[in-house]
């Protein structure tokens, strides 16, 4: 009877061993598996996932992260997932600390974070994991923390590859300029630092006579950047190889477009629409890229699977492929998947 089968499936008393064996034999024969999702819905438990990310404007890197986060939650509709996003100013430490305090106040079931402020992130993660709250990282992962999963590009290797793409075909290059974001009092981003280290390692291995000159540009002030680029290349007219280790190569390509400059090779990172448009028009020569939105999606999905199914990802550290984009293949990446 249905009642007997129900008692066997839920390990209740009142069933003989002979009957229990018959029921399990039939279950194994037909390949029955319990509907885990139906069981979850019947429990009516809500799960709160907190995501801590910087404020962003349309077209910026963090919009890709946001899109991946929200897509993962939308695809899990019906599983009682409550998403709370705490935004902060990535150039202000106190703003990040406020997002951390908000997270602790909420007492979430899981945390998604891209660490920018390393020490504060470590303190937050230590607090949460001491309460058995799982954490998923993207971009970078600070050492000495427990976490469920990490999704991101192999950063050092991407910097090494970038150097090969930029100067590998021309061993006579004597100087490369790196323009990176002036972060004020905020610490350098670990992802840019690791790419920078990889780039220098390549030069040391393959072109030790080439120097890398570092300059800071503004993330927001267009006129300041125009003056900066004008002044630098007036003083360094022979420098023809340019790199930025963050997602803002389009700031440099805008200057090149306005000034009509076509004799320089610019390499950048990340598949922002502005970068990809510049790649198409030739002001950016190469983009080294990852699928940021997919990484954010997978990170949040790993948290949901753990909360709902108690399922850990197959791997703790999940490194994405490194995509090399040129004007000849960029159209295939402009299509939304």
Residue map of PLM features:
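Hinge/cleft segment of the Venus flytrap/periplasmic-binding protein
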Residues: 26, 30, 186-187, 203, ...
């Amino acid at each position: 009877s249905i009642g007997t089968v129900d008692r066997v499936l839920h390990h209740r008393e009142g069933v003989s061993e002979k009957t229990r064996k018959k029921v399990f034999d039939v279950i194994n024969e037909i390949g029955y598996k319990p509907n885990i999702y139906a069981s979850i819905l019947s429990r009516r438990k809500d799960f709160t996932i907190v995501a801590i990310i910087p404020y962003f404007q349309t077209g910026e890197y963090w919009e890709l992260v946001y899109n991946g986060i929200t897509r993962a939650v939308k695809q899990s509709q019906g599983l009682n997932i409550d998403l709370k996003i705490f935004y902060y100013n990535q150039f202000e430490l106190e703003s990040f600390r406020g997002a951390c305090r908000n997270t602790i106040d909420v007492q979430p079931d899981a945390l998604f974070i891209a660490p920018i402020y390393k020490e504060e992130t470590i303190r937050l993660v230590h607090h949460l994991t001491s309460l058995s709250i799982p954490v998923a990282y993207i971009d970078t992962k600070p050492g000495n923390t427990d976490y469920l999963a990490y999704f991101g590009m192999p950063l050092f290797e991407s910097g090494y590859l970038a150097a090969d793409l930029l100067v590998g075909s021309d061993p006579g290059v004597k100087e490369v300029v790196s323009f990176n974001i002036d972060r004020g009092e905020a610490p350098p981003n670990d992802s840019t630092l690791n790419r920078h280290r990889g780039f220098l390692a390549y030069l040391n291995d393959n072109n030790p006579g080439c120097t890398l000159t570092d300059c800071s540009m503004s993330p927001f002030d267009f006129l300041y950047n125009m003056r900066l680029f004008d002044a630098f290349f007036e003083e360094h007219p022979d420098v023809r190889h340019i790199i930025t280790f963050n997602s803002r190569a389009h700031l440099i390509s805008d200057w090149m477009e306005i000034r009509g400059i076509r004799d320089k090779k610019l390499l950048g990172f990340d598949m922002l629409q502005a970068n990809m448009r510049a790649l198409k028009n030739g002001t950016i020569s190469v983009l080294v890229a990852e699928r940021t939105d997919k990484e954010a999606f997978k990170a949040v999905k790993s948290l949901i699977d753990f909360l709902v199914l108690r399922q850990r990802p197959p791997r703790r550290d999940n490194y994405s492929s490194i995509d090399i984009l040129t004007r000849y293949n960029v159209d295939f990446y402009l299509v939304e998947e």
